[in-house]
Amino acid sequence: MSGVWGAGGPRCQEALAVLASLCRARPPPLGLDVETCRSFELQPPERSPSAAGAGTSVSLLAVVVIVCGVALVAVFLFLFWKLCWMPWRNKEASSPSSANPPLEALQSPSFRGNMADKLKDPSTLGFLEAAVKISHTSPDIPAEVQMSVKEHIMRHTRLQRQTTEPASSTRHTSFKRHLPRQMHVSSVDYGNELPPAAEQPTSIGRIKPELYKQKSVDGEDAKSEATKSCGKINFSLRYDYETETLIVRILKAFDLPAKDFCGSSDPYVKIYLLPDRKCKLQTRVHRKTLNPTFDENFHFPVPYEELADRKLHLSVFDFDRFSRHDMIGEVILDNLFEASDLSRETSIWKDIQYATSESVDLGEIMFSLCYLPTAGRLTLTVIKCRNLKAMDITGYSDPYVKVSLLCDGRRLKKKKTTIKKNTLNPVYNEAIIFDIPPENMDQVSLLISVMDYDRVGHNEIIGVCRVGITAEGLGRDHWNEMLAYPRKPIAHWHSLVEVKKSFKEGNPRL
């Protein structure tokens, strides 16, 4: 019988299940044998399809319930550990009864006295400094402890502060005049509880004061280097009236500085008759010598009437075959009639002035000054300019003159002339008037700037000159002559120079 139950496929199983259900019915249907129905009633439970399906469903349900229960228990334990156990442990670790006394105890006089005794111990200084650093981010430390620790650290550092006196300078002295309007540095209030202690200069400032004066020494060295002599040069001048030619004879140079590694130089000389730089003449190169003898003649065709407006420019160079030639120095002879009338040859010795590049002739400007003391009126008349530097690609400039009234390095007023187009020798004859009381004449100066007008872009400065008590050279002499002869126009030619960086920064001197 077991073979009968196990034989067949799914359809046989379904047929057997239908027969079994019919046999279990009461009464059995007609046509069914009683023995056959009894055998179906005695069928093993595991062979019954319905019983097997019911057992499988119960097992799966039990497994699902167990898994869900375990997951819920795990979630509950995790939440309990996160919400209850961790805060309780941190609170117990960070809040012992003896770590932080109550605020009332910190504010008591006995606690402050004990804290002051502990602060006197130098061994606790490192710990206190660390506490001050931590107090900025630690809200648990009381504010009273932070303030007392900071006061002790400040008092201790003031006693150990090193004081040195920096080198005085004119720039700082001039700044002190404007200091009271801003703040009094020496009168800063450090609080009533911390009186300023007497500061004693340390041994560093006494032993090596030159360390603090190094900046001023460097400035003096740079100034002396700019004015030092680089040897001497000997030349002669003579004018040939028949051919209207100026004859310049370069004779020799003496005591030139060494520019090569071997301790010598390869000098030669360039000659210009300014303002014409297109005509450039040059001597031969003399190898490995610091005292060359040139003995060469150079001819410049120029009318005798123009000699007063010409300048002789000599530039001494060191020849270098494989790189740029080094400039040794230069000599500029402003007055060709300085030694004689050029009717006969005259020998001239000049010091070679230190220079790193050839000087550029920017031109000259002629103006007159006239002061009326009774009216307090200063009149500057711009007459003309000559030989201005070409600023445009056309070889010309569009010059105009700007006059600025300065007082203690500050510009009070400025006025301009008209613009002259496409010329290097403009003529203006325009008067510029400033109202200046007589008592203020020693405090003001005039800055005359020759500008090149550009339709597109910024206007460029061709050159400047300055007149006033604080000016130098001809600018000061012209100003003093105007004051000596009031109500009389005093006219002079002034050479234009480049705007120096020191003047841009507010230095009243050019």
Curated annotation (Swiss-Prot):
Domain C2: start-end pairs: 229-350, 361-494
Positions bound to Ca(2+) 2: D260, D318, D320, D326
Residue sites binding Ca(2+) 1 per the record: D260, D266, D318, F319, D320
Residues found modified as Phosphoserine: S216
Biased composition range(s): Polar residues: 160-172
Coiled coil: none
UniProt keyword terms in alphabetical order: Calcium, Cell membrane, Cytoplasm, Cytoplasmic vesicle, Disulfide bond, Membrane, Metal-binding, Phosphoprotein, Repeat, Synapse, Transmembrane, Transmembrane helix
GO cellular component terms given for this protein: cytoplasmic side of plasma membrane; cytosol; exocytic vesicle; membrane; perinuclear endoplasmic reticulum; plasma membrane; synaptic vesicle membrane
Entry remark concerning the domains of this protein: The cysteine motif mediates homo- or heterodimer formation via formation of disulfide bonds.
Family: Belongs to the synaptotagmin family.
Protein name: Synaptotagmin-6
Phylogenetic classification of the source organism: Eukaryota, Metazoa, Chordata, Craniata, Vertebrata
